[in-house]
Design a protein with these regions (language model features):
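Gly/Ser/Thr/Pro-enriched helix-cap/hinge segments flanking short amphipathic alpha-helices
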Residues: 155-167, 180-307
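Beta-propeller blade repeat segments, especially FG-GAP/WD-type strand-to-loop junctions
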Residues: 23-52, 93-107, 142-157, 195-218
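Repeat-based blade/solenoid architectures
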Residues: 1-3, 56-74, 111-123, 160-172, ...
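Surface-exposed loop and edge beta-strand positions of immunoglobulin-like domains
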Residues: 5, 18, 76, 89, ...
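Surface-exposed intrinsically disordered loops and tails
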Residues: 33-46, 59-66, 234-238, 298-301
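Calcium-coordinating acidic loop motifs
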Residues: 5-12, 30-31, 76-83, 100, ...
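Solenoidal tandem-repeat scaffolds enriched in leucines and small polar residues
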Residues: 2-5, 13-25, 29-31, 47, ...
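Hydrophobic beta-strand segments that make up the repeating blades of beta-propeller
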Residues: 14-19, 84-90, 135-139, 183-188, ...
Length: 307
């Protein structure tokens, strides 16, 4: 399985590879080095990757040195500190690798999100639109786990399904366009699964606003890259049409929220290209900063009003 993200905010995409057997790999993209305003291109015109999982502490070795059977992985800034953290779903204890200045520490046990239920997949999403990323892990042996992020290392699990679904992988997206993230869980068909069952794929509709009468707001954003140069500033303004790899920081009055358009994760799936920001009770944003792949950031200082 793979999970792609710009973990070090240097403008290029890095690749995490979870392996069923053996240590996991992490390929750091070193095509570009430096800050967005002072970038150095390596002489090699092709992407230049170096494997650094062990160095960064995310190889996830087990005591028997065959790894922990990584089956799902996803990047997300769960603590809103402007760098992407990594959640790894294992057939063993899951991991939450907290990213602090490009140094990783497993905090899953401390934050009580290390589900040991044969997890196959994982998805980040702000399901209650409070400005913090929540977490959904798809499991085989027991029901899926839903962790609602309360902040300061606290998570609420009362929203977890109470039935066994045998989920292969999971993605989050606003299926019905109401501003609240829904979840699609792909069922796993096994010849000799638990109780001999063959599990059906499930679509979970988010009913948070119906049941809690939440007043939290939200913003959706769709980016589109261009092959043309507009600013004549010496930089190429070219970006792929789907804006893969673009990173956006939404500036609220008391909080900055970062999201990224990713190229893929887990068992051959990806989250929607449309970015979703929960804004808590804020009616508007102060602005946003868009970091296009491999170029200067573009800052929109105009007032952004929630949809």
């Amino acid at each position: 399985i793979i999970a792609i993200s710009d973990y070090d905010n240097d403008g290029d995409q890095d690749v995490y590879v979870g392996r069923k057997y053996g240590y996991n790999w992490f390929f750091e993209n070193q095509t570009l080095t430096g800050s967005p305003g002072d970038v150095t291109y390596h002489s090699n015109p092709e992407p230049f990757f170096i494997e650094k999982a062990s160095e960064l502490g995310i190889a996830d070795p087990a005591a028997n040195e065959i790894g922990s059977m990584g089956y799902g992985a996803a990047w997300g800034d769960y603590d809103n500190d402007q760098d992407f953290d990594l959640y790894l779903a294992n057939w063993g204890l899951n991991r939450l690798f907290d990213n602090e200045n490009n140094t990783f520490t497993n905090v899953a046990d401390v934050q009580s999100v290390e589900s040991e239920e044969l997890s196959n997949g994982v998805s980040w999403g702000d399901y209650n639109n409070d400005g913090r990323l929540d977490l959904w892990t798809s499991n085989i042996r027991n029901p899926d786990d839903v962790y609602i992020n309360l902040g300061n290392g606290a998570w609420d699990t009362t929203s977890s399904p109470n039935f066994l679904s045998g989920t292969q992988d999971v993605i989050s997206g606003d299926i019905n366009g109401d501003g609240w993230l829904d979840v699609f869980a792909a069922g796993l068909e096994m010849q000799n699964g638990p109780q001999g069952a063959k599990y059906t794929s499930l679509l979970y509709k988010n009913v948070t606003v119906d049941e809690s009468f939440s007043t939290n707001h939200w913003l959706k954003l769709r980016l589109e890259g261009s092959q043309y140069t507009f600013q004549n500033d010496g930089w190429s303004d070219k970006a792929n049409l789907s804006a893969m790899g673009a990173r956006v920081v939404l500036h609220l009055a008391d909080l900055d929220i970062m999201r990224e358009i990713i190229g893929g994760k887990g068992h051959g799936n990806m989250d929607p290209l449309q970015l979703h920001f929960g804004m808590n009770t804020h009616l508007s944003a102060q602005g946003m900063t868009i970091y296009w792949p491999s170029r200067d950031p573009e800052t929109n200082q105009r007032k952004v009003t929630y949809i």
